[in-house]
Amino acid sequence: MATTNDIKNGTVLKLEGQLWNIIEFQHVKPGKGGAFVRTKMRNVMSGKVVDKTFNAGLKIETATVDRRDYQYLYQDGADFVFMDTQDYDQITVSGATVGDATNFMLENQMVNIAIHEGTPLYIELPPSVVLEITYTEPGLQGDRSSAGTKPATLETGYEIQVPLFVENNTKVKVDTRDGSYLGRVND
């Protein structure tokens, strides 16, 4: 048992027989009244995101989660196959569990998988990844009233907005949390 004061991003709670992963949290201490913790959490099985508020100091049940490094091997239909880098065991993870991480995963990439009682809960990517742009229109200077961006397709098929000077076959750094362009990468 833990208290709401122990909540942080990535904590997995057991509430009403379900597992919930904390995405965001905020400890609030108003001038009047008791302190509380405002959270945004995702149901591990359904993917549903809800906002929930807890009173500060409330006892809550946390789930024991094992986080291990895995290497992404390949996609098998709607599922994804990963290899444990310590014992070389392979596990298959459903596309629903992988979620938006597919937008930033390449074969042989290292990821962190959270596992509870043998079941993969979610995938944690590094904060940023380097991917190559496979297609983007040429950037035209002029016809705009603000800083120019254009759509670009990454080698994973995901589309992001990049500055006008970025061209095809350019390696770029992308934020895996929101899919934003962070900069060009020199080889």
Swiss-Prot record:
Subcellular location: Cytoplasm
Keywords: Cytoplasm, Elongation factor, Protein biosynthesis
Organism: Arthrobacter sp. (strain FB24)
Family: Belongs to the elongation factor P family.
Purpose of the protein: Involved in peptide bond synthesis. Stimulates efficient translation and peptide-bond synthesis on native or reconstituted 70S ribosomes in vitro. Probably functions indirectly by altering the affinity of the ribosome for aminoacyl-tRNA, thus increasing their reactivity as acceptors for peptidyl transferase.
UniProt entry tagged with the keyword Protease: no
Gene Ontology CC terms: cytoplasm
One GO BP annotation of this record: peptide biosynthetic process
GO molecular function (one): translation elongation factor activity
Matching NCBIfam families: efp (TIGR00038), PRK00529.1 (NF001810)
Pathway membership: Protein biosynthesis; polypeptide chain elongation
Predominant subcellular localization, coarse grouping: cytoplasm
Pfam families noted in UniProt: EFP, EFP_N, Elong-fact-P_C
KW Cytoplasm (keyword) present: yes
Transmembrane residue ranges: none
Top-level taxon in the UniProt lineage: Bacteria
Designated name of the protein: Elongation factor P
